Curated annotation (Swiss-Prot):
Official protein name in the record: Multidrug resistance protein NorM
UniProt feature coiled coil, ranges: none
Keyword Transmembrane helix: yes
Transmembrane stretches, start-end: 11-31, 53-73, 93-113, 126-146, 159-179, 193-213, 242-262, 276-296, 315-335, 349-369, 391-411, 417-437
Amino acid sequence: MHNYRRETRQLLTLAIPVLIASVAQTSMGFVDTVMAGGVSATDMAAVSVASSIWLPAILFGVGLLIALVPIVAQLNGSGKKDKIPFEVQHGFLLALIISVPIMAILYNAGMLIDYMDVEPILAEKTIGYLHAVVYAVPAFLLFQTLRSFAEGLSLTVPGMVIGFIGLMANIPLNWIFVYGKFGFPEMGGVGCGVATAIVYWLMFFSMLVYVLVNKRLKRAGLFDVWYKPQPKAVLRLFKLGFPVAASMFFEVSLFAVIALMISPLGSIIVASHQVAINFSSLVFMLPMSLGIALSIRVGHMLGEQDLVGAKIASHCGLIVGLIMSLMTAILTIIYREEIALLYTDNADVIVLAGQLLFLAAVYQCSDAIQVVAAGALRGYKDMRAIFIRTFIAYWMLGLPVGYILGMTDWIVEPMGPHGFWIGNIVGLSAAAIMLAMRLRWIQCQSDEFQIAMSLK
């Protein structure tokens, strides 16, 4: 008999290291924001605008490679471990291929910024950050390939350890480049980009060493045999990962486009938005980590053809995610001004950020449901459904509602950033409903249908 308590415990055992690793990685953004804000509100705003371009671009690549997690988990669960190195090596190849267009986009993003009506000094600092962080792209994606390999084998601790190494390195490197220590010039927000590039190369090499020395990972024989690159294998991995990448891109770019749209409203509003979005990203790590753990559990169980276990794991994930999000939403509402104070002492930024954090708290339950349900669907390899539903929710519902409320007087007087955050509530709630309904539909189908879907 399956036991809900046991399954919840196993999910949390997988999710907690993923959470710690994700919080460590996202905390790098927190550190960047705080240390850039220590120079000026303009530097903080530059990090915000640059992140609104850098994050969607790099997370598209990460989304492609996250598809390795259910692939490795199913091969592991079905006893076909000898096929894992072939898949992961083609993941490396895909990471290097996709790095090229991402780097080109980031390096030439100045053309996009030139079209934006932003202060000249803000534009200069934003472009400087992007030109520095472009060198992080291949390292980030190669690191993600190794992390997906380890997590597919239910080893989530390595990502946690390496994440903390990155965070611990990011703080002194920011101090050196942002404030100009040890003979380096004071670079302000641009220094955050330099530090980020160095940190991700450090994380990649640290993860590579871990894979080479860890006994369990060594048994997988990742580098025992080098397979001849097969374009069909790379294309298959791309096709499987593209819906995940696109859905991640649509969610992150929703917030990125908002940052770009409100950038002409001034540094105070942009900085307030950055505070709210950065803290929301930290909170989002809780359900996101649970979603990753759930994709591992569901993928492994489907590899064993344990359909009941996959269903129970999905239920446990959704329940735990909802409980956690209720708790974080309440705490965010109660302590929203204290949270803003962690980022800046600018009174105007604190007031506006507190208002946006209240709106962020409203959608935390919806955000948890949609990301956990998406994790379960990744375990079933139902990637296309995630892509379609998130596109509709974020771009056909959330962003139009946000723009209408924030920038026009069609319904009410322009609400500025508040209108966009109300649009976020609409978009994420729609995504939660559609993805949860899709998961329920799959689990109501025949055993043969579910197994066939997981093997495609």
